[in-house]
């Protein structure tokens, strides 16, 4: 019995060590220099120009047809000046977006995010892009009603929210091509600039530095 107990203890210690190593690996993010990526342009992407009332009408129509609207967005990180930078799409010099968009009915989060990354950042939106490693969901925001702003929690009195936005940490390979529509720019924005800068980047993107605070960054040299 003593030998069996010791063997079981050793097996448990080994399993715990493996789990701890897996956790450390999951919380360590390799960041590659911005200079190791290629940036190009493609045909302009049609963008809906709408006022708030038009957006509310569109949200109501979408909800009536498909129920809860779910959007997925990618947090892509690169290294510049030994500091993490987030890749953001800029439209008309004042509108910033994370790469991503709305899921199709029945589409999974990961499938939809990869499709949106191909649409926004690759030459051919109909061909899947290799290299992106979609990791964990680092944050969720909810729109309780059509006219309201989004919250990082679902109010307890809301049983049928109208929209959910999920942020995923997407790890990049050492090299990647980013081909962006001509009417957009792809900018590398430092975490220190995003931090609580809601006026410029909105309530979601300005919270990204806090969402990433549990991760450690390994600045890779090429």
From Swiss-Prot:
Identify the residue position(s) of the site Interaction with RNA. Answer: 55, 201
**Which InterPro entries does the annotation name?**
Cleav_polyA_spec_factor_su5 (IPR016706), NUDIX_hydrolase-like_dom_sf (IPR015797)
Nudix hydrolase domain spans which residues? 67-194
One Gene Ontology cellular component term attached to this UniProt record is: mRNA cleavage factor complex
What single Pfam family name could you report for this chain, choosing any that match? NUDIX_2
Where are the stretches annotated Interaction with RNA?
94-96
Q: Which GO terms describe its molecular function?
A: metal ion binding; mRNA binding
**Subcellular localization, as worded in the UniProt entry:** Nucleus
Print the keywords alphabetically.
Answer: Metal-binding, mRNA processing, Nucleus, RNA-binding
Q: Which Gene3D superfamilies match?
A: Nucleoside Triphosphate Pyrophosphohydrolase (3.90.79.10)
Placement of sequence motif Nudix box = 101-122
Q: List the disulfide bonds.
A: none
Coiled-coil region list: none
- Report the principal subcellular site: nucleus
GO annotation, biological process: mRNA 3'-end processing
CDD domains, per this entry?
NUDIX_Cfim25_Nudt21
- Member of which family? Belongs to the Nudix hydrolase family. CPSF5 subfamily.
Q: What does this protein do?
A: Component of the cleavage factor Im (CFIm) complex that plays a key role in pre-mRNA 3'-processing. Involved in association with CPSF6 or CPSF7 in pre-MRNA 3'-end poly(A) site cleavage and poly(A) addition. NUDT21/CPSF5 binds to cleavage and polyadenylation RNA substrates. The homodimer mediates simultaneous sequence-specific recognition of two 5'-UGUA-3' elements within the pre-mRNA. Binds to, but does not hydrolyze mono- and di-adenosine nucleotides. May have a role in mRNA export.
Assembly and partners are described as:
Homodimer. Component of the cleavage factor Im (CFIm) complex. Forms a complex with cleavage and polyadenylation specificity factor (CPSF) subunits FIPS5.
- Protein name in UniProt: Pre-mRNA cleavage factor Im 25 kDa subunit 1
- Give the organism the record lists: Arabidopsis thaliana (Mouse-ear cress)
Query: What's the encoding gene here?
Result: CFIS1
């Amino acid at each position: 019995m003593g030998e069996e107990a010791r063997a079981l203890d050793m097996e448990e210690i080994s399993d715990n060590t493996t789990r701890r190593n897996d956790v450390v690996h999951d919380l360590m993010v390799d960041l590659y220099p911005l200079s190791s990526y290629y940036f190009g342009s493609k045909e302009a992407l049609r963008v809906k120009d709408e006022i708030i009332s038009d957006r509310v009408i569109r949200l109501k129509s979408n909800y009536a047809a498909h129920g809860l609207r779910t959007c997925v967005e990618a947090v892509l990180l690169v290294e510049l000046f030994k500091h993490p930078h987030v890749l953001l799409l800029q439209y008309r010099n004042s509108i910033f977006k994370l790469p991503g968009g709305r899921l199709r009915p029945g589409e999974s989060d990961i499938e939809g995010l990869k499709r949106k990354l191909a649409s926004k950042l690759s030459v051919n939106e109909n061909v899947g892009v290799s290299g992106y490693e979609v990791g964990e969901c680092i944050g969720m925001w909810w729109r309780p009603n059509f006219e309201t702003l989004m919250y990082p929690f679902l109010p307890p009195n809301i049983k049928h929210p109208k929209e959910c936005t999920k942020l995923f940490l997407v790890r990049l390979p050492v090299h990647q091509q980013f081909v962006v529509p001509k009417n957009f720019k792809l900018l590398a924005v430092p975490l220190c600039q995003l931090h609580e800068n809601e006026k410029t980047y909105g309530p979601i993107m300005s919270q990204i530095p806090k969402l990433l605070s549990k991760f450690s960054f390994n600045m890779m040299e090429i």
